């Protein structure tokens, strides 16, 4: 968190209008099996990697407040219903769905209930796979 002000200040100076974050809650998006998967490039399992890269709710809220204080919009990609609920509680103006989740219809339908704009990434998916 210590580098956040410097990065956000630089973003503002560069003309950034919207900061897009990723909201991960490892316990809500990964099974216990993820604790057994260890990529070859690390000693940590996938669960630990995601958990270590995730901001706590308090830290993410502070990030959002700092972004807004600087006059930029804060949006995020939630990877679970719990993450979507967190963002909804903060009344963010829009949600981003990552290309890996563009077929996660239960999550997308859940987020649609918030009546906010959704930016849907499709990545390398083809039209058939996203219909």
Where are these regions (language model features)?
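Glycine-rich anion/phosphate-binding loops
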Residues: 1-10, 56-58
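Active-site glycine- and acidic-residue-rich loops that bind
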Residues: 1-4, 119-130
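Catalytic domains of carbohydrate-active enzymes, especially glycoside hydrolases
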Residues: 6-24, 91
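Conserved, mostly hydrophobic/aromatic
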Residues: 11, 87, 121
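Glycine-rich, proline-tolerant flexible connector loops at the mouths of alpha/beta enzymes
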Residues: 17-55
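Conserved beta-strand positions in the central sheet of alpha/beta enzyme cores
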Residues: 18-20, 76, 96, 119
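Active-site beta->alpha loop and helix N-cap motifs at the rims of alpha/beta catalytic domains
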Residues: 40-105, 113, 127
